[in-house]
């Protein structure tokens, strides 16, 4: 998360979370189009790190990195802690615009088991979304595994209606008001990236996720990832919100394992706002000693030019 904090109160923030694989130091998503209220004096940033072998670094120290905030190098941190990944709120979005195959149905059952049993994420922190005709729908929340929810996914196509972006907005709004306010929140999207009927645009879906502090991880259900507009949309959704894009072919459980591994080595750092200059503050995290360390986060935060 990158968020200016007022001295006496913490305002809503948006997350900057890191994921593994093929990244360079400080890679981030698109510029958020939001402002904060005035009198903010502190920035909080959530991130993760990997080593040269693409493994999460669980022993990171505050001296191992520096933050570059709008060209100001920050090494004097107010706080530095490991994130509590057991509070993770996970939502899964299933693109049901086409028939959900028996294989995918089985994979969803495995995913629910992985999240609840193997990863130790409480059942109440898990929800499942899908399309119901042209409308977003919540299949379950808090009892997905007990209700065998994966078996109740629609077995027939939604007649070409694909409200993907609307469903992302719907799920992000749900997560924003659900669970621990300080919990990291992630929406895992299983889709081909196509949208045929949403009122919301791709940009509005990204904005909704950022405003709700939800990051998107997208598992591409296309047969081939390259040259597809849907794949490009999924890459945009993931990249702009600090998540990760998983190209085909790939297994659902395998992708979730990678996502969960990332949260086990995530951190939160806070520092005094280095500049009250209005506008976009680009943020990067760079290694100070081990140049093989790599960090990934969103691009920064937007500071207001007037009192809101």
What are the residue ranges of the model-derived segments?
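Bacterial N-terminal signal peptides
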Residues: 10-22
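Scaffold/interface architecture of coatomer-like assemblies
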Residues: 26-308
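Bacterial N-terminal signal peptides that target proteins for export
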Residues: 1-13
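Residue-level recognition of conserved structural "scaffold" positions that shape functional pockets
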Residues: 2, 15-18, 200
